[in-house]
């Protein structure tokens, strides 16, 4: 992906793509279109560098980009390593370092004390890209900055191969500009992505874990995006069928048990039973306490209208009724 090398054309394409749908654009804010370009570029560089197929894209960004589930944005690129437990410490550290270097090619690192982490099993790094839009920030989304997380503690299985295309590629396709796609290497590409059903289970277990914490409202507020994602995952036909299956219940129990062994944080959660969760015992009051956070944070992350708080509560109630 090299469209950014032609700065004037890049800026013009972003502005054209950000126009309303009736005006031939995508109806998505310019800051989202620009950041999406750089996220997709990093993912494409990862796909090229990951010759052994050990890196898997996961998290909320993967839902919208790979599966078209939901319409929210995230500044982070979440990557998990397959079969990390079968690698030596040095091999794993080398692999993570290699992926980080390739995915951030041409970008400047931003070292943030207390946030940047470069361990042998986990990396969290911030990078700056050259801005082409004037908008500096919308909600939690900052222009000019990417967050890359590479994690060897997760088990990203099952996964599948998905086609990824940037918003700009989508716009160029719709507007009949295939020649620009070819000239600037803007073609869609394939990538290993965590199965959406596994993502559903992980997000649900994460919410349960946070709800069992001593300071559960604070912990759940930090995961408000999970409520949004679960609403749209429930709306997906394959995920709905999965929720009805014995496979889901088995996967949920296994992952919850796994997390109890792996995560000591947040404080207090490991000693409590599932039935102690305020999401299960008193969803109405718990969600009412979280609604302000949802209404404040999610509109700035979504590029389409967000579900109402009532719709989110109904979806979460449906899912919790299954477990």
List PLM regions with ranges:
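Betabetaalpha-Me/HNH-type nuclease active-site subdomain
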Residues: 64
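Structured mid-to-C-terminal alpha-helical surface segments
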Residues: 1-55, 67-71, 82-323
């Amino acid at each position: 992906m090299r469209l950014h090398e032609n700065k004037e054309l890049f800026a013009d394409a972003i502005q054209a793509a950000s126009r309303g749908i009736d005006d031939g654009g995508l109806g998505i804010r310019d800051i989202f279109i620009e950041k999406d370009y750089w996220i997709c570029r990093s993912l494409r560089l990862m796909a090229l560098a990951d010759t052994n197929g050990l890196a898997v894209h996961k998290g909320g960004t993967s839902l919208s980009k790979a599966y078209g589930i939901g319409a929210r944005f995230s500044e982070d690129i979440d990557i998990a390593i397959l079969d990390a437990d079968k690698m030596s410490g040095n091999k794993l550290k080398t692999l993570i370092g290699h992926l980080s270097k390739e995915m951030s090619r041409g970008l400047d690192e931003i070292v943030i004390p207390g946030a940047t982490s470069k361990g042998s099993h986990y990396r969290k790094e911030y990078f700056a890209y050259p801005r082409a839009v004037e908008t500096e920030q919308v909600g939690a989304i900052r222009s000019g900055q990417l967050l890359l997380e590479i994690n060897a503690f997760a088990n990203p299985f099952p996964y599948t191969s998905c086609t990824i295309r940037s918003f700009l590629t989508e716009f160029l396709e719709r507007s009949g500009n295939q020649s620009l796609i070819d000239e600037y290497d803007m073609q869609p590409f394939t990538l290993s992505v965590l199965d959406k059903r596994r993502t559903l289970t992980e997000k649900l277990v994460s919410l349960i874990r946070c709800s069992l914490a001593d300071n559960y409202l604070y912990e759940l507020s930090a995961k408000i995006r999970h409520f949004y994602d679960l609403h749209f995952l429930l709306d997906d036909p394959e995920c709905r069928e999965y929720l009805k299956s014995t496979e889901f219940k088995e996967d949920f129990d296994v992952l919850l048990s796994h997390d109890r062994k792996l995560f000591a944080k947040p404080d207090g959660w490991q000693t409590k039973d599932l039935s102690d969760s305020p999401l299960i015992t008193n969803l109405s009051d718990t969600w009412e306490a979280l609604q302000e956070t949802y209404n404040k944070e999610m509109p700035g992350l979504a590029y389409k209208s967000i579900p109402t708080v009532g719709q989110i509560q109904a979806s979460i109630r449906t899912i919790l009724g299954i477990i």
